[in-house]
Amino acid sequence: MHIEFQKTMQQLAAAQVSGLGDVVKEVSDFTPIDFRVGVQWLVAQNNPHLAQALAEAGLSLYPDSEDILVISGLLAMTREDWPLAIELLQDLVKVQKERVQPMTCQMLARAWACNLDMDQAHTVLDSALKIWPDNETLIQEKNTLILSSLAMAASPETH
């Protein structure tokens, strides 16, 4: 990690940061990669609240950065904030366009499924499988989604 960035992260982690504005002010000179690495480091240091604040600061400064959209989407998923994860991963798909990766589609489908919108999850995976028909990860995700959909349909207590 960039030494100056690491020092800033350590200072932020040691201090009681009062809000997003304080974080943005402290890190406004850093790159999207610095933000991604910083969020990873803060999560590894068991500081999820500051990691979230840093991700939000990164998004406010670089809203179209793949690095920040990826880490922010993953962070939202770990927090089980499915609507935010969906929004961030959809933004990532829009930014990547034809460069979108199978894992991005897998994570987006999973976020939709966890948000209990199985139709959207199937739509994402079906679209991805048209691009990568032999991708084992996507095939496995689709099979898991089919089983989950069947289990949900069979259970009267869902929804």
List each model region and its residues:
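Start-of-helix register in tetratricopeptide repeats
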Residues: 33, 67, 101-103, 137
